[in-house]
Amino acid sequence: MNNATIIAIDGPAGAGKSTVSRLLAKELGYTYLDSGAMYRALAWALQREGVDLEAEAHVARALPELPLEFSTRGGSLLIHCGGKALEDELRNPEMAAYASRISQMRAVRTFLTEWQRKLAEAGKVVAEGRDTATVVFPHAGVKVFLTADPAARAGRRHAEYLAKGIRVDYAVLERQIRERDEADSTRCLAPLRPADGAVILDTSDLDISEVMSRLMDLIREKSRG
């Protein structure tokens, strides 16, 4: 795997990782690898099979038998479970909560880390998540840690849900984000932190065009060596 073909973007929930990664992949002609969608898909598949998400041993036993497939085409990540394409069902607060729960399980992280690395072998990728640069692709050619204050992140997530027709209370979202930050940064397994050599970018007061401009400058600088 050529390290120069991987751009790894980490950061807390709502920092803009998904939006920025999707735009970067399109701009560069890379594949967008959405690890959050992969965790939500796994949670959805486990629920579909009636697996108790609180029982790590049950989850670990179920993983090899799940009819879950990840692939890439035309720069996009495709997710199927039992022949069904998973898209909108993964984008709701409930599934995000389930994904957060199983993401703390070692067997789950190992399972999806292997999938992410396998997908990256097929070509150039922009990969995003919470341990993408620290664990999944520690030797990525470009490593970025996107962050923003919790209020700004809650506002962005609230707007995303409203755009999808999902009504969610802003205060609840902000509380969930703060709780998720605490859980992610203090967990024993792959805690949320900037990777060695990562560029830290606070997006609290930046719009998407400003973030993209800074990241493209960084990528050009890295490509020049």
Swiss-Prot record:
Location in the cell: Cytoplasm
The UniProt record lists the keyword Cytoplasm: yes
GO cellular component terms given for this protein: cytoplasm
InterPro entries on file: Cytidylate_kin, Cytidylate_kinase_dom, P-loop_NTPase
Reactions performed catalytically: CMP + ATP = CDP + ADP; dCMP + ATP = dCDP + ADP
MF (Gene Ontology): ATP binding; CMP kinase activity; dCMP kinase activity
UniProt keyword annotations, A-Z: ATP-binding, Cytoplasm, Kinase, Nucleotide-binding, Transferase
Database matches in HAMAP family: Cytidyl_kinase_type1
Family: Belongs to the cytidylate kinase family. Type 1 subfamily.
Protein's UniProt name: Cytidylate kinase
Source organism per UniProt: Syntrophobacter fumaroxidans (strain DSM 10017 / MPOB)
